[in-house]
Amino acid sequence: YDGTNCKPGVCWEPKPGY
């Protein structure tokens, strides 16, 4: 994803290697 990644119930900023 671009910007922030979101899963059911949690969101976080994309980290290198993910």
From Swiss-Prot:
InterPro entries, alphabetically?
Answer: Meth_DH_bsu, Meth_DH_bsu_sf
Q: Name one GO molecular function term.
A: alcohol dehydrogenase (NAD+) activity
Q: Name one GO biological process term.
A: methanol oxidation
Disulfide bonds listed in the record: 6-11
- Which SUPFAM superfamilies does UniProt cross-reference here? Methanol dehydrogenase subunit
Which Enzyme Commission number(s) are on file for it?
1.1.2.7
What the entry lists under Pfam families is as follows: MDH
Highest taxon listed in the record's lineage:
Bacteria
| Keyword entries, A-Z | Disulfide bond, Methanol utilization, Oxidoreductase, Periplasm
Where does the protein end up?
Periplasm
This entry carries the following GO cellular component terms, namely: periplasmic space
Gene3D superfamilies associated with the record: Methanol dehydrogenase, beta subunit (4.10.160.10)
Show the catalytic activity. Answer: 2 Fe(III)-[cytochrome cL] + a primary alcohol = 2 Fe(II)-[cytochrome cL] + an aldehyde + 2 H(+)
Protein family (similarity comment): Belongs to the methanol dehydrogenase subunit 2 family.
Protein's job? Catalyzes the oxidation of primary alcohols including methanol.
Subunit structure, as described in the record: Heterotetramer composed of 2 alpha and 2 beta subunits.
Name this polypeptide is given: Methanol dehydrogenase [cytochrome c] subunit 2
Q: Which organism is it from?
A: Methylomonas sp
